[in-house]
Regions:
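C-terminal outer-membrane beta-barrel translocator/porin domains of Gram-negative envelope proteins
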Residues: 2, 152-282
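Gram-negative/organellar outer-membrane beta-barrel architecture
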Residues: 1-183
Length: 282
């Protein structure tokens, strides 16, 4: 659910500023969302955004919180009649009715394992400000966030069992001069951001070169507090192929460049979290 034109200031002043049960009038946004895929995945979040924080200048401020849990598949699934029939059909050439085991179907949901899971929750606060220099198209934002990971027999990270904490600050300098946020016909966009955690390994007095990557106890201790510095650069340029004044829906040629770098403070303590994926945006 998304409530636009929300007003936190009018929350305790019912009357003409209310529309139904919600206060209106300040252009703020309140968003509450939930997503679930039965027993395997659940996600809940709430956020508040004020584009005119303070009421006098277009300074943005937001608060948000989220919680999610994802479970894994039991090893019994891969030994089920469904999987066995699939592999048997591949190697024996049986492509008929029995290949899909319709008569004895073992559905995926019967094999979820609640003991194998990753739980995450976090909170964040963001402040953004328009800049006058170098020009009026620049904006600076700063976000302080905290996430906690709770892993139970989760085989997709070096830390399979444990609790990891991620406290970071994200600083972003951006510029946008596009003429339309939905269908840009001209102008450009760019952003340069850095996300930093405290360099714990530089002052905790621990020699991480002696930690073993095959020991779960060592991995839990090493990544109890995650550390990294993450840099990202994104740029888009929109070039109209026809005169945008004369042709409202002119074809547009877009050029795009993106760059990302995940760094570490200690070569023996590299973060398994916040990494980049091939084909993803990090």
């Amino acid at each position: 659910m998304k409530f636009t034109n929300f007003s936190l200031a009018n929350l305790l002043h019912p009357g003409e500023n209310y529309r139904g049960i919600l206060p209106q009038g300040d252009g703020q946004t309140l968003t509450v969302s939930g997503q679930t895929n039965a027993k395997y995945y659940q996600s809940y979040s709430i956020s508040f955004y004020d584009p005119w924080f303070g009421g006098k200048r277009p300074n943005a401020f937001s608060l948000s919180a989220f919680y999610s849990v994802q479970t894994d598949i039991s090893s019994r699934y891969y030994n089920s009649a469904y999987m066995n029939s699939y592999y048997n059909s591949m190697y024996s050439g049986m492509y008929g009715y029995g290949m899909y085991n319709y008569g004895n179907y073992n559905s995926y949901e019967n094999y979820y394992d609640p003991d194998k899971s990753i739980k995450m929750f976090g909170v964040a606060a963001m402040f953004g400000k328009r800049l006058k220099w170098p020009d009026d198209y620049f904006q600076f934002t700063a976000e302080l966030s905290y996430q906690r990971y709770i892993l139970s027999d989760w085989q997709y990270f070096p830390v399979t069992n444990g609790k990891c904490n991620n406290l970071s600050i994200n600083l972003t300098l951006s510029r946008s001069s596009i003429d339309n946020p939905i269908y840009p016909r001209s102008g450009s966009e760019f952003s340069l951001s850095v996300q930093l955690t405290p360099p714990y390994s530089l002052f905790d007095g621990t020699d991480y070169s002696k930690y073993s990557t095959t020991s779960q106890d060592d991995m839990n201790k090493m990544h109890k507090w995650i550390e990294y510095h993450k840099w990202k650069f994104k740029s888009k340029v929109y070039i109209p192929l026809m005169d945008p004044v004369a042709v409202k829906r002119t074809p547009v040629l877009m050029g795009r460049v993106e760059f990302g770098l995940l760094g570490h403070y200690n070569k023996y303590k590299k973060s398994p979290f916040e990494t980049f994926d091939v084909g993803g945006d990090g």
